[in-house]
Amino acid sequence: MRFGLFVPQGWRLDLAGIEPAGQWAVMRDLAQLADRGPWESIWVYDHFHTVPEVTDEATHEAWTLMAAFAAATERVRLGQMCTCMGYRNPAYLAKVAATIDVISGGRVEMGIGGGWYEHEWRAYGYGFPRAGIRLAMLDEGVQVMRQLWADGRASLDGKHYQIDGAICRPLPIQAGGPPLWVAGGGERKTLLTAAQYAAYTNFDGTPDTFVHKSEVLAGHCTDLGRDFAEITRSANYNVVIAPTEAEVADRLDWIQEHYRTVLPGQAERQRQAFASGPLVGTPEQIVDALRSAEQMGMTYAICYFVEAAYDTSGIELFEREVVPALAESAG
């Protein structure tokens, strides 16, 4: 099994209480911790406004961070979960990703999706097209990006994008461009796009849903004549880990108090949300949960530690006791 680590960027109120001028140092240090450790990749979210409610807390922009992490790290791969196609022209996005791929020595992962956060869309002047239109934009955008990365030029007279001889030089270091991660579990459109283009998928990691979405994806692959085994299936997990169950409860208490300071009305709800996840417990319990997920076909876990900006002990415990236990199944 392979592992990715989310670096807190503020979107989930995970830099609250840290002065904005000091937040980059926190993010950089965590990226470098991952770079020295067993993590294959680091990730940020492509969002502009905080969740679970919109606040004035800082949220750092994903692709700016990609460039900064490219310069600050040496080994770890760099991903976004996931870039919203509607937020940037796809030719421009392909150019940005290609440049960062060069800066990083070929370490970019291209997470891409149709987008969902209506408040952001409207606030930034993008409107909010219905889901079918957003997913059609995703499909056209992926076509443009693949052309640019393969050939250095692209044209598309699409319904949503009109690209006329866009040039992308230098090409990405990775032949054909960064691997595409198509995120989301929409069964008619998103998973069809994944079956067409994705090297990786990312959808709900809870057992019943993961199995069902995998079956839908496999069906699309069969219809398209694609080998389902070519696609690596990943999932995102909130991790709450501690040496003992009593200390896990303490960690959950910390989460509740953290949200009480920044969003009091959400404190109990957030504690419950984190407590209900599959990766909550001692290292042994989390290893068991991940082994069960692996049996379903989930071979790439991307892990979020809400306390990471303030306390790295959970990350370090996961590195010591969880990753090695699953190392024999890496691939």
List where the protein language model places each region.
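N-terminal beta1-alpha1-beta2 module of alpha/beta enzyme domains
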Residues: M1-A72, G176-P178
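Hydrophobic faces of well-ordered beta-strands that scaffold small-molecule active sites
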Residues: F3-V7, I42-V44, R77-Q80, V108-I112, ...
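An alpha-helical appendage that flanks or caps ligand/catalytic pockets
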Residues: V7, A131-P172, D204-T299, A309-S313, ...
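Active-site mouth loops of central-metabolism enzymes
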Residues: Q9-W24, T83-A91, A175-G186, Q272-E284
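Acidic (Asp/Glu)-rich catalytic clusters
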Residues: D35-R36, M66-R75, A97, D101-R107, ...
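Glycine-rich, proline-tolerant flexible connector loops at the mouths of alpha/beta enzymes
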Residues: S41-L65, C84, G205-F210, Y304-I315
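Alpha-helix-loop-beta-strand connector modules within alpha/beta enzyme cores
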Residues: D56-G79, M137-V144, E316-G331
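Internal, glycine-rich beta/alpha segment that forms the wall or movable "lid"
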Residues: G86-Y197, V211, E215-L217, A229, ...
